[in-house]
């Protein structure tokens, strides 16, 4: 009986340690996801001086030949800053947890707008 109790206590301690480690890993995971989200936001909202585009949204400005067209393009885009679309977030959306949180927040917004 004493042997079983020792084994039980040993397993209980192992479980406690595993739960602590799980919490630490989840915190680190959340931190990494937030970092990816922030970097992605920075990249998607970047306003490069060349206005050539980026790998996610395309290179529409790449073939513009004259600097006059570039200046006009820059001026017209500067006042029409479009909000970021969550569908453009290919890295964040690849995370199951981010996609789940996004769906939940969209559901909450729809519920609030219906009230």
UniProtKB/Swiss-Prot annotation:
Entry GO CC: histone acetyltransferase complex; nucleus
Coiled-coil residues: 1-43
Alphabetically ordered keywords of this record: Chromatin regulator, Coiled coil, DNA damage, DNA repair, Nucleus, Transcription, Transcription regulation
Pfam families: NuA4
Subunit details: Component of the NuA4 histone acetyltransferase complex.
Similarity remark: Belongs to the EAF6 family.
Name of the protein in question: Chromatin modification-related protein EAF6
Species of origin: Kluyveromyces lactis (strain ATCC 8585 / CBS 2359 / DSM 70799 / NBRC 1267 / NRRL Y-1140 / WM37) (Yeast)
């Amino acid at each position: 009986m004493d042997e079983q109790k020792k084994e039980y206590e040993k397993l209980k301690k192992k479980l406690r340690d595993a739960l602590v480690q799980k919490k630490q890993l989840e915190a680190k995971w959340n931190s990494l996801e937030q970092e990816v989200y922030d970097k992605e936001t920075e990249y998607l909202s970047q306003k490069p001086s060349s206005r050539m585009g980026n790998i996610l949204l395309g290179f529409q400005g790449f073939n513009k030949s004259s600097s006059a067209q570039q200046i006009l393009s820059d001026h017209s885009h500067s006042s029409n800053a479009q909000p970021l679309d969550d569908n453009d977030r290919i890295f964040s959306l690849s995370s199951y947890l981010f996609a789940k949180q996004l769906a939940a927040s969209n559901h909450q917004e729809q519920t609030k707008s219906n009230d």
